[in-house]
Design a protein with these regions (language model features):
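Glycine-biased, small-residue-rich flexible motifs in mid-sequence functional cores and linkers
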Residues: 1-33, 46-53, 57-58, 83-90, ...
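An accessory alpha-helical subdomain
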Residues: 35, 40-42
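N-terminal accessory alpha/beta regions
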Residues: 53, 60-75
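Extended, charge-enriched "interface" segments that sit outside catalytic cores
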Residues: 80
């Protein structure tokens, strides 16, 4: 943990605009990500950054809010709402002090310290804020993600432990969502083997920092826990956050091992894997087929997932998927014409993307 960490002025402004500071009540609701995106783009169009809002310049804020929204589906926030959110400075200070006492830090998308991997993979859908504790270098470390049902079968659990051990032997971080079942099985096995862990949480980041199983790893650089949601958000109030969390898991990893899955939108594992497989340049999604209780894994195979051969090593399985992906890219280039251009990141400016 970086003891000298300090909030940048840009991040202070984004916190004021987008965070609830653990409170449900307030005269003005914090901006949603789509609302923040249109506001940030308008601000950037005037040659300004979020930090410029801290002066509470009503003329500037009025000019920003008077801009036409860049999205036909999202209304530009009103001037009074922006001013009301920005005037919560004392509340922000109290909240940040509390988070810091738990070892929690915050970066915003307007911050140069924001994870490049998250920014590049999700672009305009990257969360405006990330709250984290532990080794921030693991944001860029890649690794293997592990997902699956909360009610995990014995076969799936053993498969996870075996693959985790293979990944740790190769020095690969283990990425998971921290939930009961597949996620915690992967994290616990990684800790037991001395591996590094990245946990993408939906809620209760403060509580997770105090868990005995996490404390040592957070302090010695062996773990990174992060969330795009208020660190004081409790399990009963996170709603669709669990579905959003899937995107962050896939963004942080180089591939994903699906140990067990149902079928359909009611299965978060299924929905996350299907969404990833629809991406034009998705990361490899591997499925474990040795679990009779997992009909979803068989169906994911039909949608482009790859079978994980339990008789082969982690390196061998990943080499096979890399060869297959290379063949697909060659076919795609021959079919569509090759283009080496990188996708444009919205609102890119020095210091970070607002």
């Amino acid at each position: 943990m970086d003891e000298n960490f300090a909030l940048t002025p840009d991040t202070q402004a984004v916190l004021l605009l987008c965070s609830a500071f653990g409170r449900k009540n307030g005269a003005f609701a914090p901006l949603t990500l789509p609302q923040y995106n249109v506001f940030a783009k308008a601000l950037n169009g005037l040659g300004k950054r979020p930090a410029d809002l801290l002066e509470l310049d009503e003329q500037l804020i009025g000019e920003v809010c008077a801009q036409e929204s860049s999205s036909p589906k999202v209304q530009m926030p009103e001037k009074e709402r922006i001013l009301g959110l920005l005037r919560r400075g004392m509340t922000l200070s109290t909240a940040v002090d509390k988070w810091s006492s738990y070892g929690v830090r915050v970066v915003s998308r307007a911050d140069g310290r924001y994870p490049k991997r998250m920014r590049d993979y999700l672009m305009g859908k990257a969360p405006a804020l990330l709250y984290y504790a532990g080794n921030a270098q693991l944001f860029e470390g890649g690794g293997m993600a592990f997902v699956g049902s909360r009610d995990l079968s014995a076969e799936a659990g053993e498969a996870i432990r075996k693959v985790v051990r293979g990944c740790v032997d190769l020095g690969m971080p283990i990425v998971s969502g921290g939930a009961r079942g597949a996620d915690q099985t992967a994290m616990q096995e990684a800790f037991a083997c001395g591996g590094k862990v990245v946990g993408a949480l939906t809620c209760d980041l403060l509580k997770a920092c105090l868990e005995p199983s996490n404390r040592d790893a957070l302090s010695n650089g062996g773990a990174l826990l992060f969330s795009a949601f208020d660190p004081e958000l409790r399990p009963f109030s996170y709603g669709a956050a669990a579905m959003e969390r899937n995107k962050f898991i896939y963004a942080m990893a180089d591939g994903c091992f699906v140990a067990q899955s149902g079928i359909g939108s009611k299965s978060g594992t299924w929905s996350g894997a299907v969404e990833e497989l629809k991406r034009p340049s998705h990361h490899p999604v591997y499925v474990f087929l040795g679990n009779p209780a997992s009909e979803g894994c068989v169906e994911l195979l039909k949608k482009g997932a790859l079978k994980w051969d339990m008789d082969k090593s982690v390196a061998e399985n990943m080499a096979s998927s890399s060869a297959r992906k290379a063949e697909q890219l060659i076919e795609q280039d021959l079919f569509n014409g090759f283009s080496a251009a990188e996708p444009e990141t919205p609102y890119e400016r020095k210091g970070g993307t607002p």
